[in-house]
Amino acid sequence: MALRLLDFADEWDSRLVTDAVDWLATVAPAEGGAAFVEPSVAEGPHAPWWVPEQGHPASLIQTGQIAGVLYARGFSHPWLDRATEVMWSRIETLSAPSGYEMFGVLAFLQHVPDRARATAAFARVGPLLLAGGLVALDPSAGGEVHSPLAFAPLPSSLARGLFSEAVIEAHLDHLAGAQGEDGGWMFNWPSWSAAAEADWRGFLTVDALRVLRANGRA
């Protein structure tokens, strides 16, 4: 979340990011990349779904999203080299991803420098979004669902071509209308603490404004 906010706000600090990725390399799984959560999460309060995976494997969710924003910023680091190997290996065998895993996959494919390989990989895994029922095409769908804008937030997004213009416009209308009285946006998954809710609402508000602006909804 932190790296993405630095990117969204155009407050990228190369020294700060280098320190963060240096640390990330010290806790990386044996194969490279980033775990979903570190075992140390158990030492304090945390979301109930923050459960360390047995064997400390790399996570598509975390590895892909971190690698994606680093590539978008032209960042280089040995951690990123190994993370890239992990992502290509996982994407080659991807068959039934979760929606959250696809966030990582798409972030990586959107920005990885090998564009020919990324385009070919997306042609295979992109349709899994629809085939796997990972996207709620109805803007009014309730529960913990993923909007097309979650996977294709910008006109330049790789996944934008999977959805009709009418679907995108309907979801933009819904996003604009979901702004709360305090000016912020709320998430659609369980809120387990006031602190976490404040953190996520802040992030999603910045993201919602970014998406609306990029799609001509000033």
Question: Each predicted region: which residue ranges?
Answer:
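Preference for long, amphipathic alpha-helical scaffolds in soluble/luminal domains
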Residues: 1-218
